[in-house]
A protein has these predicted regions:
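The two-metal-ion catalytic cores of nucleic-acid processing enzymes
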Residues: 1-223
Length: 223
């Protein structure tokens, strides 16, 4: 690919998305978190086989919280206590949750090796208290500990989507219009749900042109 000919050029959805699958492929190389969403940067493969620069913003992530019931309590008791409080605090109409058995192998005392927790999916993007996290030491009448309250969006992405470092991703249902021109990349895409981003087994690694910038401070001898 002649990369110089692609600089400054914006590619359209029709040039990128496979008409048979409705998806496109991206080799992600870097990321950043912005306004409780995840921005992925990397190389996107066009329908003609070109590799172009791309930015994909992924919304809709949920933080996975695990509430440990007190002795003599069960997940249903925790649900009855905590769900209404979370809905009020974060301005949510509903919250998904379910009992889930988990193992624990770290240093905190009084944590069972294996037991049933209440798993709660708390959206990162909420109408209220969106930057307020749940502290691990939070306790209630029915629970004595909370895991996952400080998990960041990138950690949620790699764990929930099973992404093992830079790799090829198959991305569906991308919006190519809403973010057009938001970055200096050739393609800017918005994806509303992380479930539309799936890692795939493709060992071909795209070429990458890099530039290194060294910044040095120098004292002004005149001042």
């Amino acid at each position: 690919t002649n990369t110089s000919s692609l600089l400054g050029r914006q590619f359209t959805k029709d040039q990128v998305v496979d008409e048979n699958t409705g998806s496109f492929r991206m080799y992600w190389l870097d990321f950043c978190e912005f306004d409780n969403t995840l921005l992925l940067f990397g190389k996107i493969r066009t329908r003609s086989g070109q590799l172009i620069s791309g930015m994909v913003q992924v919304k809709g992530f949920c933080r996975e919280l695990f509430f440990l019931p007190r002795e003599g309590k069960v997940a249903a008791d925790v649900h009855q206590e905590i769900i209404p409080l979370l809905m009020e605090k974060y301005g949510l109409d509903n919250i998904r949750s379910k009992p889930e058995t988990k193992k624990y192998a770290f240093e905190l005392p009084n944590i069972p090796h294996e037991t049933e927790y209440l798993k709660v999916l708390l959206p990162y993007q909420t109408s209220k208290s969106k930057n307020v996290t749940i502290p691990a030491e939070l306790e209630g009448d029915t629970f004595c500990h909370v895991f996952g309250g400080n998990t960041n969006i990138f950690e949620s992405f790699v764990v929930q989507r099973k992404v093992m470092g830079p790799c090829w991703l198959e991305i569906k249902n991308g919006d190519f219009d809403q973010l057009k021109g938001a970055s200096h990349c050739a393609v800017d895409v918005l994806v509303s749900k992380p479930e539309n981003v799936v890692p795939i087994a493709d060992k071909m690694v795209p070429d990458l042109n890099c530039i290194s910038v060294s910044v040095q401070t120098v004292m002004n001898p005149r001042e």
